[in-house]
Design a protein with these regions (language model features):
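TRNA-binding/sensing appendages of the translation machinery
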Residues: 1-86, 142, 164
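Positively charged, Gly/Ser-enriched RNA/tRNA-binding surfaces
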Residues: 20, 26-37, 50, 85-96, ...
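A structural signal for short, well-ordered beta-strand segments and their strand-loop junctions
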Residues: 42-45, 107, 162-166, 268-270
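Beta-rich nucleic-acid/ligand-interaction surfaces
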Residues: 47-63, 166-176, 273-281, 372-376
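Acidic, His- and aromatic-enriched active-site or binding-groove loops in soluble protein domains
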Residues: 65-73, 179-202, 209
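Cap/lid and interdomain-hinge subdomains that line or gate substrate/regulatory clefts
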Residues: 136, 140-141, 164, 174, ...
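Extended alpha-helical scaffolds
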Residues: 155-158, 162-175, 182-184, 198
């Protein structure tokens, strides 16, 4: 590698300079404090784990996104986490299983992806999230959405939030009712995610399903909009199995609760919203800035994962990329905060004064010998005492 190339970072890997890092740290502190005010306890999972543990109960996409390496101590395969959610589920199921009937945990940390998850996205995002364990009802889903919206407002990155909400049980139940093979289910899933109407029609024609199954699966791509979508769904999916009707009832309950608790929230019901289809088990949701196609936070219910760690329990939650949120904020110019400079000196009285100033939250830096004074204020000895004065106005004594 040449000198010219030695400073290059891998594609999709970024770093934060002081101003960006300061802004991100402020976000970090304010959001963790906010989650604690909701009763969520912070946990810090490790950056790497044994691969089989890291991928337990997760979708194939997470396996693809995970960097893998060999542990030089045990010879076993390790994975660098690409998502902290399974790690927190492991902690909840194994280490904290007897702590509370309903457990609320939050987390923040760097993750690493083998490939970017979207155009222009970072491969080393900082993931922040929160999970509720031990409650299967719509109330915990609503709490997750409500807190997600609260955190987004706290960041100042958005003034208005558009929420897409769906339920993976609808498509799953219809696919089972239609008797789709796993290959057919995957192909139709892909087309539904892209809202590719012509492809959906061609696939359904090729599957040769009975009329009811064909029409209900065809209707999914069109069933999105405000709460009136649920009324349309009750008609168009009238022949659906009970599991689908239960999923629709859950969506109705959740959307009603959200309308009461967050009347300013713009809610879009999308019955073909299948984000995390192979991982989630119920409601799925994503938050957007109105007019943007890029989700700024997302989550859903995943009731099965705890079983893989020996303690089955319902769970729901959400996560976001703190780096991406920071890009939505205006650049904050460095405040011209008072910085106090002092010449290098080992006077005990000076050292005590510097310590007291720092305890009071002041910024004090030592001027290295030969370096120019660049601070707004200077600590000088006047009448036998160390005093803070504006640079250029001091007199020694």
């Amino acid at each position: 590698m040449t000198i010219k190339e030695s400073w290059l970072l891998p594609e999709g890997i970024d770093e934060l300079l002081p101003q960006e890092a300061s802004q991100l740290e402020c976000l970090h502190r304010s959001l963790v404090d906010r989650m604690r005010s909701w009763g969520y306890q912070l946990v810090v999972p490790p950056l790497v784990e044994y691969l089989d543990s890291l991928l337990t109960g997760t979708a194939k996409t997470l396996d693809i996104q995970t960097f893998k390496l060999t542990d030089q101590m045990s010879g076993r395969m390790l994975g660098i986490r690409a998502d902290m959610t399974p790690q927190v589920a492991r902690i909840a199921a194994h280490k904290l299983r007897n702590q509370a009937e309903i457990l609320r945990l939050c987390y923040i940390g760097s993750v690493l992806h083998t490939l970017p998850q979207g155009q222009g996205t970072s491969r080393n995002p900082i993931q922040l999230g929160a999970e509720i364990y031990g409650h299967a009802g719509p109330e915990s889903d609503v709490e997750s959405i409500e807190m997600m919206a609260d955190l987004l407002h706290v960041t100042g990155a958005v003034s208005e939030i558009a929420l897409d909400i769906g339920h993976v049980g609808i498509y799953r139940g219809l696919a089972e009712y239609a008797g789709l093979t796993s290959e057919q289910e995957e192909a139709l899933f892909s087309a539904l995610q892209r809202k590719a109407a012509a492809e959906i029609d061609a696939l359904l024609d090729n599957f040769k399903l009975d009329d009811d199954a064909h029409q209900m699966l065809q209707a999914l791509a069109e069933l999105n909009g405000d709460r009136s979508v649920l009324e349309q769904a009750s008609t168009k999916l009238a022949q659906a199995p009970e599991s689908v009707k239960e999923a629709l009832a859950t969506l109705s309950t959740i959307s009603e609760m959200l309308s009461q608790r967050l009347p300013e929230l713009v809610i879009n019901l999308d019955l073909a919203e299948l984000r995390g289809y192979h991982y989630h088990t119920g409601v799925v949701f994503a938050a957007y800035k109105p007019g943007s196609a890029q989700a700024i936070a997302a989550g859903g219910r995943y009731d099965d994962i705890g079983e893989h760690f020996g303690h089955a329990q319902p769970a729901t939650g959400f996560s976001l990329d703190l780096k991406m949120i920071a890009t939505l904020l205006p650049v904050i110019e460095d405040e011209k905060a008072e910085v106090i400079g002092v010449e290098w000196d080992s006077d005990p009285a000076l050292l005590e004064t510097v310590s007291s100033l720092r305890d009071a939250g002041k910024v004090v830096i030592y001027q290295m010998p030969g370096a120019a004074i660049t601070t707004s204020h200077t600590l000088v000895k006047q009448a036998g005492h160390w005093q803070v004065t504006e640079t250029g106005t001091q007199t020694r004594g």
